[in-house]
Amino acid sequence: MAAYAQFGYAGYPTANQLTTANTDSQSGHGGGSPLSGTNEASLSPSGGSTATGLTAGPLSPGAVSQSSHHAGHKGLSTSPAEDVVGGDVPVGLSSAAQDLPSRGSCCENGRPIITDPVSGQTVCSCQYDPARLAIGGYSRMALPSGGVGVGVYGGPYPSNEQNPYPSIGVDNSAFYAPLSNPYGIKDTSPSTEMSAWTSASLQSTTGYYSYDPTLAAYGYGPNYDLAARRKNATRESTATLKAWLSEHKKNPYPTKGEKIMLAIITKMTLTQVSTWFANARRRLKKENKMTWEPKNKTEDDDDGMMSDDEKEKDAGDGGKLSTEAFDPGNQLIKSELGKAEKEVDSSGDQKLDLDREPHNLVAMRGLAPYATPPGAHPMHAAYSSYAQSHNTHTHPHPQQMQHHQQQQQQQQNQQQLQHHQMDQPYYHPGGYGQEESGEFAAQKNPLSRDCGIPVPASKPKIWSVADTAACKTPPPTAAYLGQNFYPPSSADQQLPHQPLQQHQQQQLQQLQQQQQHHHHPHHHHPHHSMELGSPLSMMSSYAGGSPYSRIPTAYTEAMGMHLPSSSSSSSSTGKLPPTHIHPAPQRVGFPEIQPDTPPQTPPTMKLNSSGGSSSSSGSSHSSSMHSVTPVTVASMVNILYSNTDSGYGHGHSHGHGHGHGHGLGHGHGLGHGHGHMGVTSNAYLTEGGRSGS
């Protein structure tokens, strides 16, 4: 109670006092009540009223006595007129106090009830009663008969103690107020009554500061974070940096002290300032406004200090390649473009050197530039890229003259050519490097038509494996086809003046010479010897062949590698009418293997899968009939490409190991294949055994 008396709360009873005072309070008269101090009316915050039933109810400094609403507890509130004895109540207060309504709890005002952490009592958190505040009083404000002290708002405290709440009514320094305990009374009076009051939330004057007052000495705003600093440079901040840069164009390298000064002025970090100057120097250099000598090779020693957000910013506005390094026309960085041009030049040199050394893999593999004219077969376009017109080359190569001796079939060939000119691919015989413009014109078309892969116009002729694999129908390699593509009509269709590729002839001249005397007398194939000289036999000698060599797939179909099956008699004689020479084309190789991609062949090139074995056996027989020739390595290798019993049509496909297949089938085979090769009546690129060669 000392605390209550000290702070003017003498009117609030303790629990034990209430138990003894129940009888007196029920009488309705407060005279001599132990609840009062020197004067009930003056010292009781309730204006002289007495309260009962507060042993377990919520305590509140409200003007009206409160009791809990718990069942079993009854709170009796009496107006001041009932409790006041005589004229103890001042006149000014009596009229106002009589107007106060009887209340059960201050929490009816909507204020929450809190639980005292020490005593466990439920305490209403409202410190002020609205009715009392209406008459300008604080709940602890003393009435005229009370002791005089320092009031909260200039009013008197009923205590001799000078304001036990230092934070109320006293403008303490903002620096130390948060460090002081405005509820220090708990230390002096640890009674349960006071512990309940100390839990009540009294706002201190420092609560109006939204930031730690200890930061006030630095003059920063309440929302200023010392750690974050400025995250993004603004125009205002960079204006200072730009001004400094414009004044130091001769030497745009601020010293450490200048950077620190600028960082303080702009409220930026030192790293941001350094990065800004590094980017500014780079920007001026790109704009050819560089008016200083670079310090070192990297031109900027501050680039390494660039922060992540500045790097992103620089990449957004200044990170684009300038036209000095990037050629928008060719979509290439100039350094890469230069490499591509060098490759083009070197490829041009290769074309000039083809007569001496056939290094170009496009021709050796039968790889065509992937662009094809809309109306032409892909392989036709592939080879027509090396020469513009397939009917205009009338200048046979000297080496080819010896292979075009039989020309009496020319009329038949021309007729067949008209029928099958566009049905199946044929090798365009205009030599390999005769028209560079034709080749590049075809290559300038991107792969997008067949593969969906754009290729720069400067792409060299030597295509990579990746390009081949990416294409829907990669061109079959020369190991499978050879490069002598002829219209699918018949071997006799070949015009005698169509030249053979020079480098093929040079590479395999020895094989050709060995086989020139093996040509079958009945066949007038214009390129029989050359067929063994074709890249297939050459490539087969590599023992690897091409990846597609054993796969009779859409690739072989697209190449026109279906040989019309014919009886051994027709193949041996080759004198039947063209219609007999071209029965239904059949599939070559192993029919059960199919490619992953659907065949992209014209409807006219669809294969007839029937009769493969019979035709192959027939061709094998015919090949055995033709001649027995010395077995060459190329023929041996071609065993790889033909079935053991068929040697399908290798006979036809220009000696691409055709004969070899035959030899396998019958055991005589290899030599026969050569005979075939020279003599195949059909010039199809398809595998010949079947074509009845």
UniProtKB/Swiss-Prot annotation:
<dbReference type="GO" id="GO:0030182">
    <property type="term" value="P:neuron differentiation"/>
</dbReference>
<keyword id="KW-0238">DNA-binding</keyword>
<keyword id="KW-0217">Developmental protein</keyword>
<feature type="region of interest" description="Disordered">
    <location>
        <begin position="480"/>
        <end position="538"/>
    </location>
</feature>
<keyword id="KW-0371">Homeobox</keyword>
<dbReference type="GO" id="GO:0006357">
    <property type="term" value="P:regulation of transcription by RNA polymerase II"/>
</dbReference>
<dbReference type="InterPro" id="IPR001356">
    <property type="entry name" value="HD"/>
</dbReference>
<keyword id="KW-0804">Transcription</keyword>
<feature type="compositionally biased region" description="Low complexity">
    <location>
        <begin position="397"/>
        <end position="419"/>
    </location>
</feature>
<feature type="region of interest" description="Disordered">
    <location>
        <begin position="20"/>
        <end position="104"/>
    </location>
</feature>
<keyword id="KW-0010">Activator</keyword>
<protein>
    <recommendedName>
        <fullName>Homeobox protein caupolican</fullName>
    </recommendedName>
</protein>
<keyword id="KW-0805">Transcription regulation</keyword>
<dbReference type="GO" id="GO:0045317">
    <property type="term" value="P:equator specification"/>
</dbReference>
<dbReference type="InterPro" id="IPR003893">
    <property type="entry name" value="Iroquois_homeo"/>
</dbReference>
<comment type="function">
    <text>Controls proneural and vein forming genes. Positive transcriptional controller of ac-sc (achaete-scute). May act as an activator that interacts with the transcriptional complex assembled on the ac and sc promoters and participates in transcription initiation.</text>
</comment>
<feature type="region of interest" description="Disordered">
    <location>
        <begin position="387"/>
        <end position="453"/>
    </location>
</feature>
<dbReference type="InterPro" id="IPR008422">
    <property type="entry name" value="KN_HD"/>
</dbReference>
<dbReference type="Pfam" id="PF05920">
    <property type="entry name" value="Homeobox_KN"/>
</dbReference>
<dbReference type="GO" id="GO:0042693">
    <property type="term" value="P:muscle cell fate commitment"/>
</dbReference>
<dbReference type="GO" id="GO:0005634">
    <property type="term" value="C:nucleus"/>
</dbReference>
<feature type="compositionally biased region" description="Basic and acidic residues">
    <location>
        <begin position="308"/>
        <end position="317"/>
    </location>
</feature>
<dbReference type="InterPro" id="IPR017970">
    <property type="entry name" value="Homeobox_CS"/>
</dbReference>
<dbReference type="GO" id="GO:0048468">
    <property type="term" value="P:cell development"/>
</dbReference>
<dbReference type="GO" id="GO:0045926">
    <property type="term" value="P:negative regulation of growth"/>
</dbReference>
<dbReference type="GO" id="GO:0007346">
    <property type="term" value="P:regulation of mitotic cell cycle"/>
</dbReference>
<feature type="region of interest" description="Disordered">
    <location>
        <begin position="648"/>
        <end position="693"/>
    </location>
</feature>
<dbReference type="GO" id="GO:0001745">
    <property type="term" value="P:compound eye morphogenesis"/>
</dbReference>
<feature type="DNA-binding region" description="Homeobox; TALE-type">
    <location>
        <begin position="226"/>
        <end position="288"/>
    </location>
</feature>
<feature type="region of interest" description="Disordered">
    <location>
        <begin position="288"/>
        <end position="331"/>
    </location>
</feature>
<feature type="compositionally biased region" description="Low complexity">
    <location>
        <begin position="41"/>
        <end position="59"/>
    </location>
</feature>
<feature type="region of interest" description="Disordered">
    <location>
        <begin position="561"/>
        <end position="627"/>
    </location>
</feature>
<feature type="compositionally biased region" description="Basic and acidic residues">
    <location>
        <begin position="288"/>
        <end position="298"/>
    </location>
</feature>
<dbReference type="GO" id="GO:0003700">
    <property type="term" value="F:DNA-binding transcription factor activity"/>
</dbReference>
<comment type="similarity">
    <text>Belongs to the TALE/IRO homeobox family.</text>
</comment>
<dbReference type="InterPro" id="IPR009057">
    <property type="entry name" value="Homeodomain-like_sf"/>
</dbReference>
<dbReference type="GO" id="GO:0045944">
    <property type="term" value="P:positive regulation of transcription by RNA polymerase II"/>
</dbReference>
<dbReference type="GO" id="GO:0000978">
    <property type="term" value="F:RNA polymerase II cis-regulatory region sequence-specific DNA binding"/>
</dbReference>
<dbReference type="GO" id="GO:0007474">
    <property type="term" value="P:imaginal disc-derived wing vein specification"/>
</dbReference>
<feature type="compositionally biased region" description="Basic residues">
    <location>
        <begin position="651"/>
        <end position="675"/>
    </location>
</feature>
<keyword id="KW-0539">Nucleus</keyword>
<feature type="compositionally biased region" description="Low complexity">
    <location>
        <begin position="493"/>
        <end position="515"/>
    </location>
</feature>
